[in-house]
Amino acid sequence: MTHQYLIEIGLEDMPAHVVTPSLQQFHDKTVAFLKENHLDHGAIDQYATPRRLALLIHDLADKQADVEEDVKGPAKKIAQDADGNWTKAAIGFSRGQGMTPDDIVFKTIKGVDYVYLHKAIKGKTAAAILPGMLDVIKSLTFPTRMKWGAYDFEYIRPIHWLVSLLDDAIVPMKLLDVDAGRTTQGHRFLGRPVTLGNAADYVAALKAQFVIVEPAARKQLISDQIHQIAADHQWQIDLDADLLEEVNNLVEWPTAFAGNFDEKYLKIPEAVLITSMKDNQRYFYARDASGKMVNAFIGVRNGNADHLANVIAGNEKVLTARLEDAAFFYAEDQKRSIADDVDRLKAVSFHDKISSMYDKMARTRVIADLLADRFGLSATDKADLDRAASIYKFDLVTSMVGEFPELQGIMGEHYAQLAGEKPAVAQAIAEHYEPISADGALPESLVGTVLAIADKFDSLMSFFAVDLIPSGSNDPYALRRQAYGIVRMIAKHDWPFAVAELQTTIADALKAAGKTNNLDFAAHQQDLNAFMIDRAKQVLQGQKIRHDIVDAVTVRADADLAGILDAAKILSAHADDTDFKPVMEALGRVLRITKKQQVKVDVDTAKFENPSEGQLYDATVATAKKFDDEPTEADYQALKALADPINAYFDATMVMADDQAIRQNRLAALLQLAALIKQFGDVSQVIVK
C-alpha cells in the first residue's frame, strides 16, 4: 500500500525572486530526508505562490523495509571469562543493541572468535517518520531572514499555517505557535480558508478559492492572456522570460490587462520607457507591427477581472507619474554640455581612499592610450578612444541616471549622440561597462573593448594599491567579475596582456602624466598578477580545459594572459594525439632537470662530447629563431619535432657530469631549450597515460 503526502508552508508574501529557488530547495531537502529515512516514493509535485511552498509526494511507501543485520561485538575472549560467564563487555554490548547475552552467537574471522547479534529491525511507518519533515522546513535557507513576534526563530517571512496530510490523516508537527493541520488559505481577497479532506484534493480545492498553485500552469495562463491582448490590439510583445518568472511569483490568480500612457512620452529614450515599465512596474511593453514602441503596456494583477477598469486607471496613473519625472529629467539634462558634466565629476567620489571619478577617468585615459598602441589600433580608433576616455563617465551626474542608475552608460551613449559625438565614441561609452556579468555580452567595437579593459584595469590597480583586495567570498567592488571580463576580452581579440610588466609600465606612465593620485601601485603588484592568472584559470575551466593543462600553463607568474589562453587551447587540441604522451614526457624531462638551475655561462660547442649534444643544440637554436613571442601551433609543432633529439640526447648524455665545466655547459644548452618549452608553461605537470 502506498500513500500521498502533502506538506505546505503558508507564509506572508515572499519576494518574487525567492520563490522558485526556495521551492527547489524544499524539494531537494525533502528527497534527501526520504532517502535518509529509507522511505521509497514516486513523483513529487512542486507547488508555489507568493504565500506558500508545497510538495505532494506520490506513491509514498507505507513503511520502511524490514532489515536484518548481524552486529559485530568484542572478541569471545573478552566477552566471556575463563568459566564461560558473560563479562560486562558482553552484557553492555547486547544491552546497547536492545537484546540480551542469550541472543549472542559466535563467528570466526581469521582464526579469532567474535561475538555477534542477529537483529531483525522492523521498519518504521511513514506516519512515524514524517513528523521529521519539520526539520526540513526549519533547515531551508534564504538570502534574507526576519524574526517575528517574541521568537528568535528566523525565516524568509512569518509562517502563518502548516498543512501536513498523509492521505486523509494529519501528520502532527508544530513550529512556534503554528500546529500543522488540514486547513490551507485561499486567495487573500477572493478566497476563503479551505479544509482539505485528503492530500489529493489540494490543487482542485485551492483553484476553487482563486489560487493556482502550479507555477507552470499559472505562467502559461499569464502568457496566454498576454498573447490574446496583444493579438486583439495587433501588438508585438517581448515576453521577457525573467519578467514573466517574476510576475508569476507575484500572483496567485493572474488577470492580464492593457493600459495606455500619453503619446508625448514616446519622445523619451526607449531605454527609459522600458526601464520604467519593465523594471519599475513589472509591465510588458508593446510595439506595433513595424517594431515601433507604442504608448501602451500590459500588466498582470493578482485577482480576477472585477473592477478591472479601476485597476487599469491606477496603474496608468502610477506609470504617468514616473514618465513625467523622466521627461523632466531628460529636458534638464540637455540644458548642460558634456563638458559641464565632466567638470562636475570632480565632486563625485570613485572611492574615498582612491580618488574622484574625474581622476579615475584621467587615469583610464592614460591606460587606454598605452593599450591602444599595444593592441595595434588605427589612428582613427585611437582618436575615438581618447575622446571616449576623456568623457565616458559624464552621465553619472545626469538627473536621468540619478533616477535610473541601471541606465548608466546607456544614457551616456544617448546624450553623446545628441551632443554630436562620433558614433564610435558614443558606442564606447555604453560598452565600457561590459561584460556586466560573468557570461555577459562583450563589447562589439574595438574602441569600446579597449575602453572597457582600461577602465576595469584601472579599478583593479587602484583597489589593490589601497589594499582593498577580495578575500574569500567578500568582493564588494566586483573586482573578480571585472578581472574575469578583462580575460574574456583579451581572449576574444588575442591581444598581448602581460600583467606583471603592464602594471609597471602603467604606473610609470601615470607617474609621468602626474595622474597617480598618490596611489602606491607597487604595493600589491604580485597579488594582482596572481589574481588575474586565477581569473584566466576560471576562463579555461569554463571552456572545459583539463585541470592539469590549466595548472601547467598558468604556472608562470610573468606570463602573458593571451599566451596562457593560447597555450592551453593548443595543448588541449593535441591531448588526444597518439604522440602527445612521448612529446610531453620528453619536454617535461628537460624542464625537470633544469628546474632551479642557474647557469651564467655561454654554450661552448667545443665542449660537446657526443653527436647528440650538437644535434639537440643546433635544433634548439634553429627553433628559437622561428619561435613567436607567444605560443602558436607552429611553435608546438617545432617543439614536437625536438622530442626524438631530446630522447637521443638523454640516452647518450650524462647532464650532471663530474666535470663542472661540462655540467655547466650542458645545463646552459638545456636552459635555452627550457625557455622555449616554458612558452607553454610547465608541461611536466601535464598528466599523460
UniProtKB/Swiss-Prot annotation:
EC number: 6.1.1.14
Entry keywords, A to Z: Aminoacyl-tRNA synthetase, ATP-binding, Cytoplasm, Ligase, Nucleotide-binding, Protein biosynthesis
Catalytic activity reported: tRNA(Gly) + glycine + ATP = glycyl-tRNA(Gly) + AMP + diphosphate
Compartments, as annotated in UniProt: Cytoplasm
Domain of life: Bacteria
Transmembrane domains' residue ranges: none
Enzyme class of the recorded protein, top EC level: ligase
Signal peptide (residue range): none
Family matches, as SUPFAM superfamilies: HD-domain/PDEase-like (SSF109604)
Family from the record: Belongs to the class-II aminoacyl-tRNA synthetase family.
Subunit and interaction comment: Tetramer of two alpha and two beta subunits.
HAMAP family, alphabetized: Gly_tRNA_synth_beta
Listed name of the protein: Glycine--tRNA ligase beta subunit
Provenance organism: Lacticaseibacillus casei (strain BL23) (Lactobacillus casei)
